[in-house]
Amino acid sequence: MACFAKGKTIIKDAHELRVKESDRIAIMTENLTEMGADVIDTDDGFIINSRSEDSIPVLHGAEINCSMDHRIAMTFAIAGLNADGETMITDSDCVDVSYPGFFAQFRGFKQLIERYFSKYVSPFMRKEYYEKIKKNLT
């Protein structure tokens, strides 16, 4: 979510994320950087500097290495929703460890977003954003 915010977001005091199923701090910073985010790895977290002037994230699709970490895979599935281009998550079946139905429900969520944009967003905004989101729904 910090990629969507204006300004600087600091995640700190998260030492334990270095010793979970994977080094989640390192993997998050690596993959966010791969998607175009301005991320700085710190000892106990990371810093995200917004590249957006109007809170619209500036992320692009990428191949995400989740290192068989279910939480990383789910995080980047969500991040990929608003990225330009396709986001591919390697070994995404690792989510079955904690949330076996995640991707089925996720597809349903993407369909809700598509319906919302087609029904409630003005044609002016829809032209610019709907195509971007629709591209990521397929």
Regions found by a protein language model. Name each.
Residues 1-138:
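Short, structured segments at the rim of ligand-binding sites
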